[in-house]
Every structure is written in structure tokens, then in C-alpha cells.
Amino acid sequence: MKKRYGIIGCGMMGQEHLRNINLIDDALTYAVYEPNPNMRKMAKLLAPEAKFHDSLDKIVSDENIDCWLIVSPNHLHMDQLEQVARVPHKPILVEKPLFTNINHLERVEKFLVKYTAPVWVAMEYRYMP
């Protein structure tokens, strides 16, 4: 059975993730939330079979998602992580940075203590010679 990805955000980095998921035999982009009409249109070209949700609440409540990719604008990551944490915990890959406001450090610490599934922060371009 293919792993069903839920994608939050499909700008430039989100579209790169969609392309990469398409290359994995046992994975599929199952659901997408992208509020920007232009980015949503691009995402539909890359993942035409995906369900496109019109709100964060709707995608988060989709019980068929096996894992999450949070690829939204940086300042939204913390709020979206907390929203995803309200439903059964599934693995999450969140693009860097994890948070943009030092005052959110305590929120991150609380999230990581309570969240029972793996959480990764993407850093694939940390070193490019």
C-alpha cells in the first residue's frame, strides 16, 4: 500500500516535494492544502489525482493521510504544526526553519514533548559545494 502524503503549502519548495513524491514507487500525494490560486494550479498539474482541500482544518481532519509535509511560508510552520498535533500523530517533515520567532521556542518544546510521531526539519541544501 502506498504512503499517502498530506502537503500543506505548494510554493516553489512544495512543488519540488511533489515532484520527488512522484518519483517514489510506494508514495503518492494524497491531499493538498494551498490557498494561493496560482500555486494551487501548479500543484494540480504535478499531482492531478490528489484531493485539494480548501482549508487547513479540512486537510488536517482527513484521516486517510499517513504522513505530513509542511512546506508553507516560514512564519506559518509553528501554528500548522500545532494544528496537525490535534489529530492522531503521524510523521511530519517540515521545511526549515521550524519557527521564525524566538518567543515560539517554548511552544516548540511543548510540541516536541507531546508529539509521539517522528518530526524532521528538512535541511537538504545545508551544504552544496
Residue map of PLM features:
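N-terminal Rossmann-like dinucleotide-binding module
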Residues: M1-A47
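Conserved acidic residues
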Residues: Y30, N64-D66
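Short, conserved SAM-binding/catalytic segment
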Residues: M42-A50, R107-L112
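Short acidic low-complexity segments
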Residues: K51-N64
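Beta-strand-loop-alpha-helix segment that lines the small-molecule cofactor/substrate pocket
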Residues: D66-I70, M78-E124
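Aromatic "clamp/platform" in nucleotide-sugar-dependent glycosyltransferases that forms part
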Residues: P73
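Oxidoreductase and adenylate-handling cofactor-binding alpha/beta cores
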Residues: Y127-P129
